[in-house]
Amino acid sequence: MSAIVRIQAREVLDSRGNPTVEAEVYLDNGGMGRAIVPSGASTGEREAVELRDGGQRYGGKGVRKAVEHVNGEIQDALLGMEAEEQEHIDAALCALDGTENKARLGANAILSVSLATAHAAAHAAGQPLYRYIGGLGPLQLPVPMMNVINGGAHADNDVDMQEFMLIPAGAESFSEALQMGVEVFHSLKAVLQSRGLATTVGDEGGFAPNLPSNEAALELLMDAINKAGYQPGKDIWLGMDVASSEFYRDGRYHLASERRELDSAQFVDYLAALADRYPLISIEDGMDQNDWEGWITLTDRLGDRLQLVGDDIFVTNTTILREGIERGVANSILIKLNQIGTLSETLAAIEMAKVHSYTAIVSHRSGETEDTTLADVAVATGCGQIKTGSLSRTDRVAKYNRLLRIEEDLGDAARYPGLATFYNLD
């Protein structure tokens, strides 16, 4: 066993130039782990709370208070504890905070230490993190969901929906899937240039052109896939993060780019029509986080043929996920480590999803860093899918490169599930 002897946190920057927390955990046997916490732009109302300083410094986004919590009372509470006892450490962190949403110490402070502890224990054991968490059994690489057109809160354009994704489920390996995505990404750039559209990128590295409608983004992806020499719906499928809570007001869905306002039933019809016209296989946050009846209608309508992913509605929280399962809401959950704030609670959410035949997708945030922990978590849990942005910006590509190294490390034991990852669809 490896006792914690020192914890050190500092303020660093994320991919949007905003401060975030980095923590290092040191063990008595020389083991050391480091983790940096990401931050979201479109956040669910019930997410664990990241602690910001307020005031003028960094526009109020400084995290000195969170850093002080780590270097002070969190370190004092954890000194001497065994790093291998992850659940015990995470429970101690939650108890020390004393709130339901980690608002006192800050989920950013707590998560940085939780993840750094796992890294330190893995280092002490001489194992990569994915092996330390996942054990010695067979492991599978995730199918990437590549956000190549950014809109909504992730881009300064007039596209309502937040993400339009390539899902190369027809590949034979992760490395082939990545190659397919890269080739379509460059094909998409050429398509945009040929139409006089902007090729600037958004927070997650995808292109962010102004478009006349949300459907126009799907048309661009179809064109790019074909021009790259692949078949939509055979080699590469499409996915969307609608992020509907960002444009849901007064009981209606406001599609500003299309000058339309739809009620819940009409918006379900709208999404169903897109699913009929395009090879969509995944829709995330199709309904507002508080529109539970709308979610039930959407699931009844499309849940047998589309992955319906709950992000803002579930916020990686097992209590809310359990309610969703009981009420027949969605058939998949997005997993964001900083939504819940500890590694143990993250793993519990993935396990609950699996037990109830919900798929789970390990996901980045729009404000990312060079930290690649989520790639290891995706492999360790065998969740089968990962969302970590487009094929540009080092904060996104770092995760893909980590997965390439893991695939190489696993060798012949590496499995890529492909279309089988959508096991709960007809």
From Swiss-Prot:
Q: Which reaction does it catalyse?
A: (2R)-2-phosphoglycerate = phosphoenolpyruvate + H2O
Location, primary (coarse class): cytoplasm
**Could you name the active-site residues?**
E204, K336
InterPro entries (UniProt xref):
Enolase, Enolase-like_C_sf, Enolase-like_N, Enolase_C, Enolase_CS, Enolase_N
GO CC annotation: what is one?
phosphopyruvate hydratase complex
Q: Which GO terms describe its biological process?
A: glycolytic process
| Co-factor requirement | Mg(2+)
Enzyme class, first EC level, given as a word:
lyase
Q: Which domain of life is it from?
A: Bacteria
Return the protein name: Enolase
* Originating species: Acidithiobacillus ferrooxidans (strain ATCC 23270 / DSM 14882 / CIP 104768 / NCIMB 8455) (Ferrobacillus ferrooxidans (strain ATCC 23270))
Gene name, per UniProt, is: eno
